[in-house]
Amino acid sequence: MIETDRIISANTVQTKDENSIDRAIRPKTLAEYEGQPAVREQMEIFIQAAKSRKDALDHTLIFGPPGLGKTTLSNIIANEMEVELKQTSGPVLEKAGDLAALLTNLEENDVLFIDEIHRLSPVIEEILYPAMEDYQLDIMIGEGPAARSIKIDLPPFTLVGATTRAGLLTSPLRDRFGIIQRLEFYSVDDLAKIVYRSAKLLDLDITDDGANEIAKRSRGTPRIANRLLRRVRDYAQVKASGVISYDIADKALTMLKVDPVGFDHMDHKYLLTLMEKFGGGPVGLDTMAAALSEEKGTIEDVIEPYLIQQGYLMRTARGRIATLLAYNHFKLKIPDSLSSDQQQNLSL
């Protein structure tokens, strides 16, 4: 995962203080969990059924873009099941012994949460298969001719895997999850509720319009909404009476160069370069990287996804093309030099 310092990126590296605040305002139960109605309804049923049978919840895979609450949902699952949660990540599990130590310390029905599960090594995956299916740990002791396999029985447990790249999971691993949940981007209404709830937990005064304005610029992502709330709080404390109103939220976010649709300076630079320097495209990735002085990976993984999701950019076989939405957003005239085919693409 490429990390960045953009305030509107869900991959932004957070400080210890920010992480501790995030943990404090996370919902602890499904009743407190805003948004994702289908996921919430399904998980309520699955958890109640497992508890009534006194069984471990089926292994659960949660995937979706960063910042939508995969870790939060895993904690909620453990809280609702009234069990302990052990947490790790795919890159950390380098040796068989690392995973074996975690598995042998689980109590009955505990939750083992593995973030970035798509980054597990093949060796670790092979150990997970019998653990997930049969609750058995199958490990090799010794080396060479003296090596032998031993089986250790494990208590029933729930593996919760989280990933932003579900397509990178191997089929054998993916097929062993009984529950698969995709988290979608949040609506403005749901994000406004999250902002309002977070503000109250942080003992902040906020109006409905103020919460709504922060939500509109948060790119459908709770992590970004909570980060923007903290920055608007700072502005309100220094420049106003501390109350976060629409006017204060608008001024603070404008100062931070986050526009009404959630674009920041990098989004503006990308789209304006594409439209003003290259006539809207099509433009190849190498050319855009050189024009922006950015790494190709940063462009593909950090800048472009949101622009594509929101319909401001198309990635075609011939290159990147700015859409009609992009021209309208910046109030730019569509060049007459564009071919009829490109004009048709722009109007889609």
From Swiss-Prot:
Main subcellular location of this protein, as a coarse class: cytoplasm
Region feature Large ATPase domain (RuvB-L), mapped onto this chain: 4-186
Alphabetic keyword roster: ATP-binding, Cytoplasm, DNA damage, DNA recombination, DNA repair, DNA-binding, Hydrolase, Nucleotide-binding
Region described as Head domain (RuvB-H): spans on this chain: 260-348
Pfam family, one: AAA_lid_4
Positions of region (Small ATPAse domain (RuvB-S)): 187-257
Any Gene Ontology CC annotation: Holliday junction resolvase complex
Domain of life of the organism encoding this protein: Bacteria
Positions annotated to bind ATP: 25-26, 67, 70-72, 133-135, 176, 186, 223
Subcellular location: Cytoplasm
GO BP terms: DNA recombination; DNA repair
Coiled coil residues, start to end: none
Listed GO MF terms: ATP binding; ATP hydrolysis activity; four-way junction DNA binding; four-way junction helicase activity
EC numbers, comma separated: 3.6.4.-
Positions that bind DNA: 315, 320
SUPFAM superfamilies: P-loop containing nucleoside triphosphate hydrolases, Winged helix' DNA-binding domain
Catalytic activity: ATP + H2O = ADP + phosphate + H(+)
Binding-site residues, Mg(2+): 71
Alphabetized PANTHER family for the sequence: HOLLIDAY JUNCTION BRANCH MIGRATION COMPLEX SUBUNIT RUVB, PTHR42848
The protein's assembly and partners: Homohexamer. Forms an RuvA(8)-RuvB(12)-Holliday junction (HJ) complex. HJ DNA is sandwiched between 2 RuvA tetramers; dsDNA enters through RuvA and exits via RuvB. An RuvB hexamer assembles on each DNA strand where it exits the tetramer. Each RuvB hexamer is contacted by two RuvA subunits (via domain III) on 2 adjacent RuvB subunits; this complex drives branch migration. In the full resolvosome a probable DNA-RuvA(4)-RuvB(12)-RuvC(2) complex forms which resolves the HJ.
Function per UniProt: The RuvA-RuvB-RuvC complex processes Holliday junction (HJ) DNA during genetic recombination and DNA repair, while the RuvA-RuvB complex plays an important role in the rescue of blocked DNA replication forks via replication fork reversal (RFR). RuvA specifically binds to HJ cruciform DNA, conferring on it an open structure. The RuvB hexamer acts as an ATP-dependent pump, pulling dsDNA into and through the RuvAB complex. RuvB forms 2 homohexamers on either side of HJ DNA bound by 1 or 2 RuvA tetramers; 4 subunits per hexamer contact DNA at a time.
NCBIfam families: PRK00080.1, ruvB
Family statement: Belongs to the RuvB family.
Domain notes: Has 3 domains, the large (RuvB-L) and small ATPase (RuvB-S) domains and the C-terminal head (RuvB-H) domain. The head domain binds DNA, while the ATPase domains jointly bind ATP, ADP or are empty depending on the state of the subunit in the translocation cycle. During a single DNA translocation step the structure of each domain remains the same, but their relative positions change.
Protein name per UniProt: Holliday junction branch migration complex subunit RuvB
Organism the protein comes from: Francisella philomiragia subsp. philomiragia (strain ATCC 25017 / CCUG 19701 / FSC 153 / O#319-036)
